[in-house]
């Protein structure tokens, strides 16, 4: 939400949550994998080197999963000169079926990639476009409507999908989720909200 609004309250919330989780043995294993990128945000905002250590701790994870790919890609882009892009792309390339959460991991991974290594960026971009078109066929009755909506809006915001062609689907999902119980959204509603704010700002 901070990316979308630039309101300090959201930044302070993230830092406070990470601080609350501090423990002598570390917190990498206690923070949900999809939230690991918060360590990059906290490091950039505070300069506190303890967050860099948290990042390094996560990178010691013995097994890569799709859920970890956005974090690993961010690390590879920032610190490793993009040398593992082929392995990152292979994680998605070798996937036979994609769930809604896999789609979210894919677009979040693309968002962390540099277009300088265009071969792999383009591969994942093209893969995303194929998958999302298939997922959209099940709207509006898909059980993955939250994941699809978030992925479409974010893809429009980072130039992976054309706003003119796909933006209305993202808007449709945004209108639809107003009636979904917040307790069932597991953070996705806030994620969609942030992307919707960015989407509308870019339209101005």
Question: Can you name each region flagged by the protein language model?
Answer:
Residues 1-20, 24-54, 140-204:
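CBM-like carbohydrate-recognition segments
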Residues 63-69, 73-149, 161, 165-184, ...:
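Extended ligand-binding clefts on enzyme/binding-domain cores
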Residues 49-70:
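Asp-box/WD-like beta-propeller blade repeats and closely related beta-sheet repeat scaffolds
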């Amino acid at each position: 939400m901070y990316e979308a609004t630039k309101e300090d309250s959201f930044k302070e919330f993230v830092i406070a949550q990470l601080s609350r989780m501090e423990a002598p043995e570390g917190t990498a294993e206690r923070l949900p994998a999809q939230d690991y990128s918060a360590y990059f945000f906290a490091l950039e905002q505070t300069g506190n080197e303890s967050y860099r250590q948290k990042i390094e701790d996560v990178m010691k994870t013995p097994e890569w999963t799709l859920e970890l790919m956005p974090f690993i890609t961010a690390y590879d882009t920032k610190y490793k000169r993009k040398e593992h892009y082929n392995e990152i792309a292979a994680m998605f390339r070798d996937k036979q079926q994609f769930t809604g959460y896999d789609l979210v991991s894919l677009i979040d991974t693309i968002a962390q990639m540099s277009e300088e290594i265009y071969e792999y960026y383009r591969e994942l971009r093209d893969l995303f476009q194929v998958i999302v078109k298939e997922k959209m066929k099940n709207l509006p009755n898909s059980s993955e409507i939250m994941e699809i909506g978030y992925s479409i809006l974010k893809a429009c915001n980072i130039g992976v999908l054309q706003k003119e062609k796909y933006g209305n689907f993202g808007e449709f999902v945004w209108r639809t989720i107003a009636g979904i119980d917040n307790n069932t959204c597991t953070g996705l509603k806030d994620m969609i909200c942030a992307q919707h704010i960015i989407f509308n700002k870019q339209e101005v």
